[in-house]
Amino acid sequence: GSNSVAAYIATPHGCGSDWGSVAPKEYWQEVRRICDHYDVLLIADEVVTGFGRTGKWFAMEHFGVEVDIMVTAKGISGCYIPMGAVMVSDEINKPFEEGNAYFVHGFTNGGHPVACAAGSKAIDIYREDNLVENSEKMGEHLFTYKEQFLAHPSVIESRGWGLCMTLELVESKESGEYFPSSKGAEGIFHSIAMKNGLVFYSTLYGQRREPMFKRGLPLMICPPLSINEEQIDDLVSRLDTTLHEWEAEMGVS
């Protein structure tokens, strides 16, 4: 029952084994309402999406929902050094602030001065160079190519925000049939992409074993937040070429 549930945790924007799934806005608003009703904490996993990746400082901003706890990493230091952080609401922090509770969370490398210095400087650069705003603007430019990608016979769906786009690749757009692992579709794709000067995040979730869900290959397009329009145009041109060559190799038409 509800009295056995302490918290609900999920990511606002998929970025890996979940095929880059993005929930409709109403979903998170309803989750927030249910959590409030049953006194359940809402935790956002922004390890990948935090610090500008989706065109906002944090992806939950797209939904207009405030969470109780947020976990972050990766972008907090610009990925220059391993670092993670947990942020909490004023309500969660209140017992600790008043001295009625203690946060027992010490471990060997906690509060590492080099990591903290890198994180502090990374956040300064995000602000000084307007990288979050650039992510939003360049994301809008990237998504102007959405229909061009969808015109490919292998691309069944395109989704995401900011500089985090997912293309779902299938063997047959009509049936939505996915590539069996025996065909090695993703490995072939990445080889062709590298030949064309592109390196993508290798998901491989559906290629190491038969996927739990019959879904296409998730191609994650996540360029640096500092990218400009000319570089996006070049990226799209190279990806378009890669898709054509890969589809010919895989017999997708």
What label would you give each PLM region?
Residues 1-253:
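Conserved N-terminal phosphate-binding loop of PLP-dependent enzymes in the Aspartate aminotransferase
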